């Protein structure tokens, strides 16, 4: 049979075919670019700090007005930490060695932070906190920090108390990364990472928030699960008798074996490696996990904790571990370069290309 189409018809058909192919390719590329990442982990594991790092790295950081929004949180964190030290001194029947600090502890304990977002820290109070932090008794109380609740950033804020106590104090990005407030509900952060458009969902880590999670996120590309390595000797804020690492293991087990995530990969951030390195020589891991036999070796201790987490993976999900320090922007930038490859691979698998 002869060709019934004219050359103009053939050209039109070819152009239409090319346009359709181009649209299919564009749709496919768009599909691959949209990646939903679920950020999970127990309270104070570093999830919100990761979100802040994404803003710094991928969204041009914080404006002055945005930084000022954190001033009240920083001041509250500082005062709460100072009061925690005073209460610990009383709990352990210890007293400051410097006479002025013996007088200051009551004033510190009674101090209340003004709830006004524009409030500042009284300069005399800043001096009292600074004096207490420099008291010779403090190293002895910090040796026992696993026996009472003290936020990880306490020492950082104490070291910067005179700057924070200035009337014109504006937090910097390091302050923001260390500022701690409870995350409730679900927040979404969107940013581009190379050819990927990331939708990062941060879920409240405290126990009362967990029931809100899982059913919403069946279609996520990957889960980033944060574990604070340094919590192996700490107790829960919500339940003071419960070991925080044990709680994280229970949560991780429930996530990796959930029917909602059977095709999801898990990126495991073993976070707060900096605090972990300082702590392991002073607080033996074997005291809290008796079967550990690697002594004060940092690598062996981290590998043991990783092993404990991977042992819970009965669903045989792909797990990609990374040692992280969420407060260190350069570290998180490097880690996310590797994470990007993992996410891209999983997106390609989801789209049927791999």
Swiss-Prot record:
GO terms for cellular component: cytoplasm; heterotrimeric G-protein complex. Residues 36-49 are annotated as: G1 motif. Residues 175-183 are annotated as: G2 motif. GO terms for biological process: adenylate cyclase-activating G protein-coupled receptor signaling pathway. Residues 324-329 are annotated as: G5 motif. PROSITE patterns: G_ALPHA. Residues 267-274 are annotated as: G4 motif. Residues 33-354 form the G-alpha domain. GO terms for molecular function: G protein-coupled receptor binding; G-protein beta/gamma-subunit complex binding; GTP binding; GTPase activity; metal ion binding. A lipid is attached at residue 4 (S-palmitoyl cysteine). Residues 198-207 are annotated as: G3 motif. InterPro entries: Fungi_Gprotein_alpha, Gprotein_alpha_su, GproteinA_insert, P-loop_NTPase. Gene3D superfamilies: GI Alpha 1, domain 2-like, P-loop containing nucleotide triphosphate hydrolases. The keyword Acetylation does not apply. A lipid is attached at residue 2 (N-myristoyl glycine). GTP binds at residues 41-48, 177-183, 202-206, 271-274, 326. Keywords: GTP-binding, Lipoprotein, Magnesium, Metal-binding, Myristate, Nucleotide-binding, Palmitate, Transducer. Coiled coil: none annotated. Guanine nucleotide-binding proteins (G proteins) are involved as modulators or transducers in various transmembrane signaling systems. This subunit is involved in cAMP regulation and morphogenesis. It is essential for dimorphic switching in haploid cells. Belongs to the G-alpha family. G proteins are composed of 3 units; alpha, beta and gamma. The alpha chain contains the guanine nucleotide binding site. This is Guanine nucleotide-binding protein alpha-3 subunit. The gene is FIL1.
């Amino acid at each position: 049979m002869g060709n019934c189409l004219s050359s103009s018809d053939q050209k039109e058909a070819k152009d239409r075919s090319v346009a359709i192919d181009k649209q299919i390719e564009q749709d496919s590329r768009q599909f691959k670019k949209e990646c939903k990442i679920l950020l999970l982990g127990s309270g104070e594991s570093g999830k919100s700090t990761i979100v802040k790092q994404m803003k710094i790295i991928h969204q041009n950081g914080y404006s002055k007005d945005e930084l000022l929004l954190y001033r009240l949180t920083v001041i509250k964190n500082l005062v709460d930490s100072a009061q925690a030290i005073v209460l610990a001194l009383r709990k352990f029947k210890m007293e400051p060695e410097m006479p002025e600090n013996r007088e200051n502890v009551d004033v510190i304990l009674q101090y209340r932070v003004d709830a006004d977002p524009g409030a500042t820290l009284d300069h005399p109070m800043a001096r009292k906190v600074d004096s207490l932090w420099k008291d010779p008794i403090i190293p002895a109380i910090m040796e026992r920090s696993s026996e009472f609740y003290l936020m990880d950033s306490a020492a950082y804020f104490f070291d910067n108390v005179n700057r924070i106590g200035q009337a014109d104090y504006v937090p910097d990005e390091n302050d923001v990364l260390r500022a701690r407030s409870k995350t409730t509900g679900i927040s979404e952060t969107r940013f581009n990472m190379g050819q990927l458009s990331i939708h990062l969902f941060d879920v409240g880590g405290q126990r009362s928030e967990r029931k809100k999670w899982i059913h919403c996120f069946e279609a996520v590309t990957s889960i980033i699960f944060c574990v604070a390595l340094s919590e192996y000797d700490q107790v829960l804020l919500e339940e003071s008798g419960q070991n925080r690492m044990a709680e994280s293991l229970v949560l991780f087990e429930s996530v990796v074996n959930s029917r909602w995530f059977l095709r999801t990969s898990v990126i495991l951030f073993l976070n707060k490696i900096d605090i972990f390195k300082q702590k392991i020589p002073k607080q033996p891991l074997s005291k809290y996990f008796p079967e550990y036999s690697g002594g004060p070796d940092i690598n062996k201790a981290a590998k043991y904790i990783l092993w404990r987490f991977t042992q819970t993976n009965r669903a045989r999900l792909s797990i990609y571990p990374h040692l992280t320090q969420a407060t260190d922007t350069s570290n998180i930038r490097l880690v996310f370069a590797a994470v990007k490859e993992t996410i891209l691979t999983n997106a390609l698998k989801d789209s049927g290309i791999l």
